Amino acid sequence: MNKITTRSPLEPEYQPLGKPHHALQACVDFEQALLHNNKGNCHPKEESLKPVRPHDLGKKEGQKGDGLRAHAPLAATSQPGRKEVGLKPQHNHQNNHDFNLSPLAEGATNRAHLYQQDSRFDDRVESIINALMPLAPFLEGVTCETGTSSESPCEPSGHDELFVQQSPIDSAQPVQLNSKPTVQPLNPAADGAEVIVWSVGRETPASIAKNQRDSRQKRLAEEPLALHQKALPEICPPAVSATPDDHLVARWCATPVTEVAEKSARFPYKATVQSEQLDMTELADRSQHLTDGVDSSKDTIEPPRPEKLLLPREETLPEMYSLSFTAPVVTPGDHLLATMRATRLASVSEQLIQLAQRLAVELELRGGSSQVTQLHLNLPELGAIMVRIAEIPGKLHVELIASREALRILAQGSYDLLERLQRIEPTQLDFQASDDSEQESRQKRHVYEEWEAEE
């Protein structure tokens, strides 16, 4: 059974006075009878009939709007052919006069008005509910909130609630109920906004799964076909097309394998992204539909693999590389560079630091007609050595000044260095003149023999 909850956020709240309704009604009847009997003691003053406003209640004597006025009947504003639900009129006096009441009588009249106002509101809500009850079969599975209806239907439940919100209605105007409720959008800033909220049904796991399945089928059905493909060809087996989701299987089978391969080859990134976005459940359903009822003995077409689509085929290589090109020439220097190992910068810097620690080099350049450069070395094994380099027109004179032991070691080293230099370029060497001509000829002969042997 539906639970009915009524609330009126804009009307003043009515708090009961602690007495039951029948006791309060008895007091009101007694006070009304007392006022009716004392009618002759008052001085009547005829005025136009005005309805009682909520802000006029509870005012003291001497203020503006003192006293209570009788309510005007509502029958004058009714329309024919419609069921009228409005405010019940107050007890009309015979002469429709105003009375100056005492505080006790005024409080009793206020309580009577509040009680009648609450009863009128209950009658109004009850009439609205009775009018909406014939529409209950049509509202089954519909959820309407703030003037809008949800797209996804839901199943009715036994614990549903019906919430009806009504704005306050002026007591001077009658309330008319139409055949269909008028639902207007809720505007918090506007006073008197009317909102009817229906909440029928509750979403269950079965309904959620059904909604997801329907949305997925709708999305697949709205996918556009290829430009050159007007309809789906019948290439699927009958056992597959007889499944519940036959349109899914038909769309999966209708796409030719060659077309898939061409699209994947032209747009590999797009094909990869689309394949990642496919739902795993859809892939499982499609594979199950394709395998059901298919004879494994027949030849089946396998979809191309991604690596085969991305890599060029052997027969397409000449077309891709139609322009002729020459292979790069490999020189002996390239082989030499390939055999060399790259030295680390840290090792070179360490070697330079060690050499600077072992050598003490001083350069001295003197000016004059003959430029002489002196190089002072302090070696741990040879000791102090001075090298003088003099530039003679057309020649370069180098002189070593050191101890005998140092000179002997240097002479041995110079001889080894001279032999290495002679092998590289013998024509650019000049030997010192000596008394032994045989030794000179022997040195020259030795140099030329080695050079000819290498050639």
Swiss-Prot record:
Residue numbers spanned by region Disordered: 38-82, 430-455
A cellular component term, taken from the record's GO annotations: cytoplasm
Localization of this protein: Cytoplasm
Basic and acidic residues: compositionally biased ranges: 43-69, 439-449
Keywords: Cytoplasm, Plasmid, Virulence
Pfam families reported in the protein's UniProt record: Flg_hook
Stored NCBIfam families: type_III_yscP
Function, in words: Component of the yop secretion machinery.
Stated family: Belongs to the SpaN family.
Name the UniProt record assigns to this protein: Yop proteins translocation protein P
Organism listed in the record: Yersinia pestis
Gene behind this protein: yscP
